[in-house]
A protein has these predicted regions:
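His/Asp/Glu-rich mid-to-C-terminal helical/loop segments that flank catalytic regions of hydrolases
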Residues: 415-473
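C-terminal motif of bacterial Sec signal peptides marking the signal peptidase cleavage site
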Residues: 19-22
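Short helix-loop-beta-strand segments that form the rim/entrance of peptidase-like active sites
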Residues: 211-213, 296-321, 344, 471
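Noncatalytic luminal/extracellular "stalk/propeptide" segments of secretory-pathway proteins
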Residues: 52-55, 59-163
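Extracellular/luminal Protease-associated
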Residues: 72, 120-220, 280, 384
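N-terminal capping segment at the start of a domain
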Residues: 35-73, 98, 108, 274, ...
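Soluble metallo-hydrolase cores and metallopeptidase-like ectodomains found primarily
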Residues: 124-153, 210-282, 294-297, 301, ...
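Metal-dependent peptidase/peptidase-like ectodomains
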Residues: 262-264, 277, 303, 313-417, ...
Length: 473
């Protein structure tokens, strides 16, 4: 997931509610939604119910090379686990497939500076998802450092670029794909994006969304490697890059499960099931599917009248591919049938901030969902922040289809402020999830109480929409 600016709201300690109570916020135009609404919870979801699902996904990763990446055996085993759980609960389950480009970086990649150190893939850099292979030597030309907010996102950042050199850029405000396309157009033979905040062993692997048009190596580098390349640019040293990647095609599955309720419209809840190339993906995003499975269990046992659809997406880490394929395949009637889509991605960050999606320009009804979730969490002792997640997770295509959307999130690489540490505990000055997209994203680091609290909030808003207490367009 990408990092976004957060809007602060005071908070307090976390609790798990037995009664789900919520009220819409003062901006709600619906008088009935602005009145206090009390929903009798069929049962509270506890962290002890969440943990077995996380352990099952961790075991799947361990049995499959430490990964659950879409297009791998680890991901398909995750699909089988989720589908079996839902069938045992009595849901109608489908596993529709979609085709996607797969990606793998082969071991042994290096970046060397003439007369200087050699840096290795994994520890010092990673080839971004859909990077091309390459074995080349060239000088370095820095771009975008005069305006770090742009960071190569604008074609004008490459004015005066020396064709045939390696482009070195800071992290900008756009998707990395745009920077790569600008670099290719300017004649770069490779692109290295330097992340000053990443130390040795910590580089992440952003996605370039598609291999189309990407014919140069594209690397995500630590601050140390970035500094070495800056020095090489200043003294004119040659830099050698050797990296090998494999790009293929695979049929990958989503999991779609629906209850047998009789309402005309369906409430849809989802979260991505795939992990990254560099770890087991337990908080990101085993936590969302684990919460969804327990919500599904409660609804199946206690509220069989509710018409609810659950989605477990593949290919999110490559660029929201599974959810995009699903929404693209919906006819107009199928889109109109969905009363709301609720997204759950990264619910248990250890240095968390509780966050409610609140996106300007989202479909009518989205603000009511956000107000409801905020009011629910406040009622159980958590005052969440609101965030515009943009295109950072699987709600994006539902938002684009003008379906009301909402969701919950607990933070990724965003740095916790002093005010947030005062409000929620944890450590100021550190990432909300220091193991985001790394091998250390394991069960032991997940905040189970937070996942459970979020699951109860999701259950509350689902029942409110399904039962008509929260009216949406």
């Amino acid at each position: 997931m990408r990092s976004f600016r957060l809007t602060a709201t005071p908070g307090s300690t976390l609790a798990i509610a037995i009664v789900l109570a919520a009220c819409a916020g003062p901006t709600s135009p619906n008088p009935s939604a602005s009145a206090a609404q009390s929903i009798d919870a069929p049962q509270a979801i506890a962290g002890t119910a969440i943990r077995p699902h996380l352990e099952a996904l961790m075991e799947i990763a361990t049995d499959n090379g430490g990964l659950r990446t879409a297009g791998t055996a680890g991901y398909e085993a995750s699909v089988q686990y989720v589908a079996e759980q839902l069938r045992e609960m009595g849901y109608s389950v489908e596993v529709p497939e979609f085709e996607m480009a797969t990606y793998l970086e082969l071991p042994g990649g290096t970046v060397g500076v003439d007369g200087g150190p050699t840096f290795e893939t994994g520890d010092d850099f990673k080839a971004m998802i859909y990077s091309a292979s390459g074995d080349l030597s060239a000088a370095v030309t820095p771009v975008g450092f005069a305006n770090n907010e742009s960071g190569g996102c604008a074609a004008t950042d490459f004015d005066g670029f020396v064709e045939g050199t390696i482009a070195l850029a800071p992290p900008g405000s756009c998707f990395r794909r745009q920077v790569v396309l600008n670099a290719v157009a300017a004649g770069a033979v490779a692109l290295v994006v330097s992340y000053p905040q990443y130390a040795k062993g910590e580089p992440r692997r952003p996605t370039l969304l598609s291999p189309d048009g990407i014919d140069i190596p594209v690397l995500s580098a630590t601050g140390e490697l970035g500094d070495a390349l800056q020095a090489a640019a200043e003294d004119g040293s040659q830099v050698h890059i050797s990296v090998a990647t494999q790009i293929g095609q695979a049929m990958v599955h989503n999991v779609i499960a629906e209850s047998h309720g009789i309402a005309e419209r369906v409430v849809m809840l989802g979260g991505h099931l795939d992990g990254v190339h560099d770890g087991p993906g337990i908080n990101d995003n085993g936590s969302g599917p684990a919460a969804l499975l327990e919500i599904a269990r409660v609804l199946a046992e206690e509220r069989p009248w509710a018409r609810v659809r659950f989605a477990f997406w593949g290919g999110e880490e490559f660029g929201l591919l599974g959810s995009g394929a699903y929404v693209d395949g919906l006819e107009a009637d199928g889109r109109a049938e969905i009363a709301a889509y609720l997204n759950f991605d990264m619910l248990g960050s250890p240095n968390y901030v509780p966050i409610v999606y609140d996106e300007p320009g989202a479909a009518a009804g989205s603000s009511k969902i956000a107000d409801f979730l905020v009011a629910y969490l406040e009622s159980v002792g958590v005052a969440p922040e609101r965030m515009d997640l943009g295109g950072g997770s699987d709600h994006y295509f539902f938002t684009e289809a003008r379906i009301p959307t909402g969701g919950l999130f607990s933070g990724a690489t965003e740095i916790k402020t002093d005010a947030q540490a005062d409000a929620y505990g944890g450590t100021a000055g550190e990432a909300m999830d220091a193991c985001y997209h790394l091998a250390c994203d394991t069960v032991e680091r997940v905040n189970l109480d937070l996942v459970a609290s979020f699951a109860n909030a999701a259950l509350a808003v689902t029942l409110a929409i399904a039962g008509g207490e929260l009216e949406l367009p």
